[in-house]
Amino acid sequence: MQITSRFTIAVHALAFIDLFQDKQRVTCNALASSIQVNPVIIRTVLSKLKEAGIIDARQGSGGSRLARPLNEISLYDIYKAVDTVDETGLFHFHENPHPKCVVGGNIHKALDDKIQRVQDTMEDELRKITMADVVDDLTKEMNRRGQSV
């Protein structure tokens, strides 16, 4: 599969931004500490989220804020912003199966539409889930553990 960790890093970052944007400046270093990745990765992800109009981020230590309400940010929006799948789709099909082999010559006809259905289904599910859903579940878990921001 071609989905990278950028997707879950972006979801984590957006949840963090939502919970802390009114309490402190949300910097790349704060996000990197929470997510446990290099700040360079955070900057790359935030840049893509900013390009997609999901966050407002200021250069330097200006911090990041949400540009849209959580219920207007779907997981699909995030996926498309940070983990764009190229024209080959989610699954990269080996390019040159042997055309004279009984399997190689027919595998694309047998598998291509199924793979596309899997990708379409995944994308449809991502469209149904918003960051509001994620932060709601996150807050419930924090409350269950007696944690707060």
Language model: regions and residue ranges:
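Short alpha-helical segments that sit at the start of domains
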Residues: 1-14
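Short amphipathic alpha-helical interface segments
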Residues: 13-22
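A short alpha-helical element within helix-turn-helix/winged-helix DNA-binding domains
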Residues: 26-35
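Short coil turns linking two alpha-helices in DNA-binding domains
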Residues: 38-41
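Basic amphipathic alpha-helical segments that dock to polyanions
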Residues: 45-50
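Beta-hairpin "wing" of winged helix-turn-helix
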Residues: 52-61, 65-67
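Conserved segment of winged-helix/HTH DNA-binding domains
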Residues: 70-96, 115
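C-terminal regulatory/oligomerization modules of transcriptional regulators
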Residues: 92-149
